[in-house]
């Protein structure tokens, strides 16, 4: 939702509205689809908003495997853009113990070589250590697991050696309990590798991103008008994974990750392959 002016306590009218199906996991699935890879969105839906989410996810050519809750309704989150972007996120339904058990049943279908992306915040009723519990449950099955969550959650999964984590500078500070300055990002990304992460992709907004594993890789961000920040980080995750699945080296994977994230930021919605390709060619020429 975009506004020309905003006055607190008064009637305000928007000049542009757009309704998108969202959630970090769904954003990653849509981005993967745009890059030619099919994935299965997992998670919970509830109420009439849950029905609409399923409908819209299916409209992207995806086949969701959601668990339908019998109470509450899936969240409606508002992104309001005036001088700055303001977010209002609803609470959403509570996930009960039996609902969590249903998700573990679905995880049993994963097999060697699969990739599982654990993305976003915990629903009400879900333990803070849930992602770590999932990784422990799947340990030894040769499944690559990606975790994109707040810093405190990322810290819990490191002992299980996630294939990829994607913190930003603020989340690095959260993980280590101290302010991480821009010039310290590389140092602390390397610390995460030593703590167990296989790949650490740090998004730095308009300054690009860096990738840490056994080496360090850097990529500057292309210039452009930011129209939408929603899904940019999720697009980065998708592009990195597709590049690695295609057998490309780490520097190219980082560059394509930044290109996809930037292309999404420069458009309304998750960027399409064509827009990403154009931007990537401009970045590397």
What residues fall within each predicted segment?
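Conserved N-terminal subdomain of the carbohydrate kinase-like
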Residues: 10, 34-114, 280-285
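Gly/Ala-rich phosphate-binding loop of Rossmann-like dinucleotide-binding domains
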Residues: 33, 139, 245
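Conserved phosphate-binding/catalytic region of the ribokinase-like
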Residues: 155, 183-285
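Hydrophobic anchor at the start of a short beta-strand
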Residues: 37-40, 64-65, 145, 200, ...
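Short beta-strands and strand-loop turn motifs
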Residues: 87-89, 113-120, 148, 166-171
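Glycine-rich phosphate/adenosyl-contacting loop at the front of the ribokinase-like
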Residues: 1-42, 50-52
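Conserved phosphate/ATP/ADP-binding segment of small-molecule kinases
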Residues: 129-215
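Short, small-residue-enriched loops and turns at beta-alpha junctions
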Residues: 93-96, 122-126, 153-155, 174, ...
């Amino acid at each position: 939702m975009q506004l020309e002016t905003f006055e607190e306590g008064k009637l305000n009218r928007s000049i542009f509205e757009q309704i998108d199906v969202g959630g970090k996991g769904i954003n990653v699935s849509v981005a993967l689809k745009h890059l030619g890879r099919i994935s299965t969105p997992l998670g919970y839906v509830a109420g009439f908003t849950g029905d609409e989410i399923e409908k819209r996810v299916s409209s992207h050519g995806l086949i969701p495997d959601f668990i339908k809750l019998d109470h509450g309704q899936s969240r409606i989150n508002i992104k309001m853009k005036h001088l700055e972007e303001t977010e209002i996120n609803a609470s959403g339904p509570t996930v009960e113990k039996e609902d969590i058990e249903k998700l573990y049943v679905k995880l049993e279908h994963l097999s060697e070589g699969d990739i599982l992306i654990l993305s976003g915040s915990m629903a009400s009723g879900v333990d803070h250590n849930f992602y770590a519990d999932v990784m422990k449950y799947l340990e030894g099955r040769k499944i690559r697991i990606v975790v994109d969550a707040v810093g405190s959650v990322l810290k819990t999964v490191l002992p299980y050696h996630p294939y990829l984590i994607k913190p930003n500078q603020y989340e690095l500070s959260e993980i280590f309990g101290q302010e991480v300055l821009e010039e310290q990002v590389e140092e602390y990304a390397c610390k995460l590798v030593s703590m167990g992460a296989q790949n650490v992709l740090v998004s730095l907004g308009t300054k690009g991103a860096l990738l840490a594993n056994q080496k360090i890789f850097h990529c500057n961000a292309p210039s452009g008008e930011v129209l939408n920040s929603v899904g940019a980080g999720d697009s980065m995750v998708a592009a990195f994974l597709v590049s690695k699945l295609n057998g490309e080296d780490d520097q190219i994977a980082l560059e394509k990750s930044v290109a996809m994230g930037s292309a999404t930021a420069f458009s309304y919605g998750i960027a399409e392959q064509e827009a990403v390709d154009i931007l990537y060619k401009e970045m590397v020429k």
